[in-house]
Amino acid sequence: MAHKKAGGSSRNGRDSHGKRLGIKAFGGEHVIPGNIIARQRGTTWHPGLNVGMGTDHTLFAKVEGHVAFRVKTGGRTFVSVLPMTEAAAE
């Protein structure tokens, strides 16, 4: 008994579109409340000061200021927004 699948039945041919993940506002960039800083799957970057996290782990600014990245002990990267008064001082 031959066990050969009938021709013309392709199992390939599926491919999903890119999800446009990554950093949207880089370090030092000016942001306003609600601006998306990073889109991610899981917590590649963690929310720091003045940064909120959505249900899909999207990081967004809570105040107007400049974006700052900081790596803490343990290797976790935290994203913060330094308010305009603090950002001007640095």
Curated annotation (Swiss-Prot):
GO terms for molecular function: structural constituent of ribosome. The keyword Ribonucleoprotein applies. Keywords: Ribonucleoprotein, Ribosomal protein. PROSITE patterns: RIBOSOMAL_L27. One of its GO terms (biological process) is translation. This is Large ribosomal subunit protein bL27. GO terms for cellular component: cytosolic large ribosomal subunit. Residues 1-21 are annotated as: Disordered. It comes from Nitrobacter winogradskyi (strain ATCC 25391 / DSM 10237 / CIP 104748 / NCIMB 11846 / Nb-255). Belongs to the bacterial ribosomal protein bL27 family. InterPro entries: Ribosomal_bL27, Ribosomal_bL27_CS. Pfam families: Ribosomal_L27 (PF01016).
